[in-house]
From Swiss-Prot:
The gene is CCOAOMT2. Methylates caffeoyl-CoA to feruloyl-CoA and 5-hydroxyferuloyl-CoA to sinapoyl-CoA. Plays a role in the synthesis of feruloylated polysaccharides. Involved in the reinforcement of the plant cell wall. Also involved in the responding to wounding or pathogen challenge by the increased formation of cell wall-bound ferulic acid polymers. Methylates 5-hydroxyferulolyl-CoA more efficiently than caffeoyl-CoA. This is Caffeoyl-CoA O-methyltransferase 2. The keyword Iron does not apply. InterPro entries: Cation-dep_OMT, SAM-dependent_MTases_sf, SAM_O-MeTrfase. GO terms for molecular function: caffeoyl-CoA O-methyltransferase activity; metal ion binding; S-adenosylmethionine-dependent methyltransferase activity. It is an enzyme of class 2 (transferase). Pathway: Aromatic compound metabolism; phenylpropanoid biosynthesis.
C-alpha cells in the first residue's frame, strides 16, 4: 500500500521479490513468467507500471501463482479485497470458469477503471461485481444476512494491513471448509525480521506491527491450516478446516 509521499520510490512495477538476487528474480520472470503471461495481463501490467503507486500492484509471478492455485482448487465463487488497477483481479477472472464470480472491493474506483477496459476487452467483466468503499461494512452485512456463510472457494486480501485481522475474523465465516484465504504482503518488504532500529520507510514501519500481529494470529488459529510463501512480498494461504 502506498501513499502520495511514496510516489516514485520504485519505477519497476511489481518488483516485490524477496530474493536476494535481482538477477535471479529477472531470470524467473523472463524464463517462466513473461513468456506465459496472457496478453491482457501483460497490457495491464505495462499500463500499471506508469502509475505513481505502481508498487501496489500484484507482481507478475504472484499473478501466475494465483492463476495456477485457482485452477487447482476448481474455484468458482471468489472475493478480492483490495483491487488497485486489477492485475490480480484479471488473473482470477481468467482462471475461473465462465460462470465464475468475483466480488471485488476497493475504496478507489478510479484505479479500478484503469484496468476495466482491458477486463472488458478480454470478455471477463461479467464475472466481476465491483463494490466501491470499505469492505468491512459489506462483510458485516453478508454475515448478518446468513446466506453467505461458507459460500466462497477463495478470498484474496491485498488491502489495508491494519485491518487484516478484522478481515480474518469475518472471512473465516464466509470461506467454505476446505476453501482458501490468501493474505498478501505477509513478509512486508522483509521488515518482519528487521531489528527495531532498522532504517525503514515510514509506511513500512507503520504497517509492520500489524503484519507481525496477523502472522502470529494466523499461526495460532486452529480453524485453519497455513502456508506462508516468499512469493512477491510474501503470501500466506489459509485453508479452513473447521
Amino acid at each position: 500500500m502506498a501513499t502520495n509521499g511514496e510516489n516514485g520510490r520504485h519505477q519497476e512495477v511489481g518488483h516485490k521479490s524477496l530474493l536476494q538476487s535481482d538477477a535471479l528474480y529477472q531470470y524467473i520472470l523472463e524464463t517462466s513468467v513473461y513468456p506465459r503471461e496472457p496478453e491482457p495481463m501483460k497490457e495491464l501490467r505495462e499500463i500499471t507500471a506508469k502509475h505513481p503507486w505502481n508498487l501496489m500492484t500484484t507482481s507478475a509471478d504472484e499473478g501466475q501463482f494465483l492463476s495456477m492455485l485457482l485452477k487447482l482448487i476448481n474455484a468458482k465463487n471468489t472475493m478480492e479485497i483490495g483491487v488497485f488497477t486489477g492485475y490480480s483481479l484479471l488473473a482470477t477472472a481468467m482462471a475461473l470458469p465462465d460462470d465464475g464470480k468475483i466480488l471485488a472491493m476497493d475504496i478507489n474506483r478510479e484505479n479500478y477503471e484503469i484496468g476495466l477496459p482491458i477486463i472488458e476487452k478480454a470478455g471477463l467483466a461479467h464475472k466481476i461485481v465491483f463494490r466501491e468503499g470499505p469492505a468491512l461494512p459489506v462483510l458485516d452485512q453478508m454475515i448478518e444476512d446468513g446466506k453467505y456463510h461458507g459460500s466462497y472457494d477463495f478470498i484474496f486480501v491485498d488491502a489495508d494491513k491494519d485491518n487484516y485481522l478484522n478481515y480474518h475474523k469475518r472471512l473465516i465465516d464466509l470461506v467454505k471448509v476446505g476453501g482458501l484465504i490468501g493474505y498478501d504482503n505477509t513478509l512486508w518488504n522483509g521488515s518482519v525480521v528487521a531489528p527495531p532500529d532498522a532504517p525503514l520507510r515510514k509506511y513500512v514501519r507503520y504497517y509492520r506491527d500489524f503484519v507481525l500481529e496477523l502472522n502470529k494470529a494466523l499461526a495460532a488459529d486452529s480453524r485453519i491450516e497455513i502456508c506462508q510463501l516468499p512469493v512477491g512480498d510474501g503470501i500466506t494461504l489459509c485453508r479452513r478446516i473447521s
